[in-house]
């Protein structure tokens, strides 16, 4: 499967603390203390404990305020420790790369992807996929929570914005259009489900979207310090 290679090998460190949601202090292997951007608005349950091994990417833009981004954490998950991708900006790039290489079955027949297209009630869809049978509104979700061995779950907190997206995708289908949700699981998992106990409203919206005809698919990733790769489709359990 296609891989998203980092410009340089990720840098090892240990998490000191995550704070203000989008910031993390990390002690690097050489003893330096740096502040990294945490591109994740979620609760990150079990992933933000101080002392956990983490991997950071170095900023490629010299004018960026923070020189580091937090990419992965080695978490003690059910079934054993493993690296988990926490950067919610990566899945869209992974999907786009998979499409370019023609190796993502969910997008078979798609001729082009347009990112960040406006639709619905002042929303933006992650991609508008052009297809001979008609355009497909594609929403991408990042998944990084595991509470039972092998079972990936989304969301890890109240996800009102994501619930609204589900309702708007359902409206697209009811209006004669096509829509799809691609869940990118940034860890080793064998199955995916919606965490209805975490956000019952999102779970209900997800079910309504499926019932309306929104296609849903989940892919797990392989992660290492050099790259992240979509590896395989995994079964999606009922929401």
Curated annotation (Swiss-Prot):
Gene Ontology molecular-function annotations: DNA binding
One Pfam short name: SfsA
Domain of life: Bacteria
CDD domains assigned: SfsA-like_bacterial
UniProt-listed PANTHER family: SUGAR FERMENTATION STIMULATION PROTEIN A
UniProt record similarity statement: Belongs to the SfsA family.
HAMAP family registered for this protein in UniProt: SfsA (MF_00095)
Protein name: Sugar fermentation stimulation protein homolog
């Amino acid at each position: 499967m296609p891989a998203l290679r980092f410009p340089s090998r990720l840098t090892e460190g240990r998490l000191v603390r995550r704070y203000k949601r989008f910031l993390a202090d990390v002690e690097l292997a050489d003893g330096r203390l740096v502040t990294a951007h945490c591109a994740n608005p979620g609760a990150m349950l079990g992933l933000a404990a101080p002392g956990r091994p983490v991997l950071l990417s170095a900023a490629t833009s010299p004018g960026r305020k923070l020189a580091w981004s937090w990419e992965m954490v080695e978490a003690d998950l059910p079934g054993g420790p493993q690296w988990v991708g926490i950067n919610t900006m990566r899945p869209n790039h992974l999907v786009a790369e998979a499409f370019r290489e023609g190796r993502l079955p969910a997008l078979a027949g798609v001729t082009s992807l347009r990112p960040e297209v406006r639709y619905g009630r002042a929303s933006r869809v992650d991609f508008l996929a052009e297809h001979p049978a008609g355009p497909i509104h594609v929403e991408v979700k990042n998944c990084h929570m595991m509470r039972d061995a092998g079972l990936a779950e989304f969301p890890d907190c109240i996800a009102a914005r994501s619930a609204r997206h589900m309702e708007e995708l359902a409206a697209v289908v009811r209006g004669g259009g096509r829509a799809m949700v691609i869940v990118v699981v940034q860890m080793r998992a064998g199955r995916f489900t919606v965490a209805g106990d975490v956000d019952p409203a999102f779970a209900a919206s997800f079910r309504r979207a499926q019932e309306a005809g929104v296609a849903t698919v989940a892919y797990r990733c392989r992660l290492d310090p050099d790259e992240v790769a979509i590896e395989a489709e995994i079964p999606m359990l009922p929401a």
